[in-house]
Amino acid sequence: MALGVPGHGASRQDLASETPVTATAPSSAVSSRRFLLWLYLVGFLDLFGVSMVVPLLNLHVRSLGASPVVAGIVGSSYGVLQLFSSTFVGCWSDVVGRRSSLLVCILLSALGYLLLGMSTNVFLFTLARVPVGVFKHTLSISRALLSDLVTEKERPLVLGQFNTASGVGFILGPVVGGYLTELDGGFYVTAFICCSVFLLNAGLVWLLPWRETSLNIPDNGWSLDGKHTTEPIKSEGTLQGAATTSTARRSERTVQAPWVEVMLALKDMKNLIFSALWDVFLMRLLMGVAVMLYYSNFVLALEERFEVRPKTTGYLISYTSALGTLAGFAVGPILRLYKHNSYMVLLHSSVLTCLLLVVYSTTCSMAMVVFSSTLLSFSTTIGRTCITDLQLSVGGAQASGTVIGVGQSVTAVGRILAPLLSGVAQEISPCGPPSLGAALALVAILIMTLNRPPFSGDGSERLKQE
């Protein structure tokens, strides 16, 4: 596969590379596949480190003397920071390049977990959440990079495999974190290990075979040359079998200061985000909150409804997480069955999610809880992959970082709303949060039904906003 074109002059040799190395056509497919596998490892380590710490955060902040209300406010601060930072970080990654932005985000996230390992009071704990809340967009940037590397038809499969690799880390992390927390000062040890994992990830990103060629983006994508000008380069690369494009059309313009470029990118994206993409982001918000409500009181609800011990519930959560990881491998075959129509896959997975939330909310049998949780692990995994692919198809690959960043902002809004809605719903019944989630999923389904996108399933007639 050709990820771009060769360099066009000695003046471009000095600039730090922003794309993976590619060689001749016969060897480029192997080289590209290796690069993807390294990115999958980055995703695995990312969630492995995070999932060691996150389940222990509430327990630790309570042990520092915080009241439940203060602990809730501190916990919601992460979502607030993610909300206001994700769009800017996504835009910034489009401007400065994936490598630089990914390295900065990983290193500053490592700093946050290092501070967390030294937090002996609530103030230090809150301070430690700031760099993580602002810069923990490493998975989003990695997904944007993956979308740059592959064609639209291959993108759902590659994103599904990336989510699968990350999911394996999310399965193993809580087990390691739970074991370490039993030791003396176990939380601090876990936080320091998480910091070390992020530093290892930064080393992997630094050592990846990057070079200064364009990615698999349209011909209005921009790359920097050695004289700090930009030139649009058209690539016809695919993941396997495509020859390297030997010619490219070029024009030059002066690069503004980074913050000016970010503001210009935000201005250029404004009409697209709030016209062609409003329904896509609304669907993401509704389905995201629906699933968060399901998980928000899962342990407490099973204990109150079925007298299931938290340890047993933990096994069920690990079981469903493992199934969610396996579901990533099903994305490719399912999309082929649907002729790569991501929209219809998303619609049908959302319908299944809604029905399963209703079953979970109303059942009186623990066996039905296991059944609904099993299928939910598949439907939610497939839905997440398809909504990301739909965003990129409508928004365009030339602003993939910005589009994914806005999507993360929408998810951050969900992280703020879900705990509030869950608290109110739990005042009514332990079944309140998942019941409310089913209602929100139904609204999302109605929006999807009434606002079918005017483009084909393979994205060949992508919406554009001039």
Curated annotation (Swiss-Prot):
Disulfide bonds: none annotated. The keyword Disulfide bond does not apply. GO terms for cellular component: membrane. It is found in: Membrane. Keywords: Membrane, Transmembrane, Transmembrane helix, Transport. InterPro entries: MFS (IPR011701), MFS_dom (IPR020846), MFS_trans_sf (IPR036259), Tet-R_TetA/multi-R_MdtG-like (IPR001958). One of its GO terms (molecular function) is transmembrane transporter activity. The chain crosses the membrane at residues 35-55, 64-84, 105-125, 157-177, 187-207, 272-292, 315-335, 351-371, 428-448. It is a multi-pass membrane protein. Pfam families: MFS_1 (PF07690). Belongs to the major facilitator superfamily. This is Major facilitator superfamily domain-containing protein 9. It comes from Mus musculus (Mouse). The lineage of its organism: Eukaryota, Metazoa, Chordata, Craniata, Vertebrata. The gene is Mfsd9.
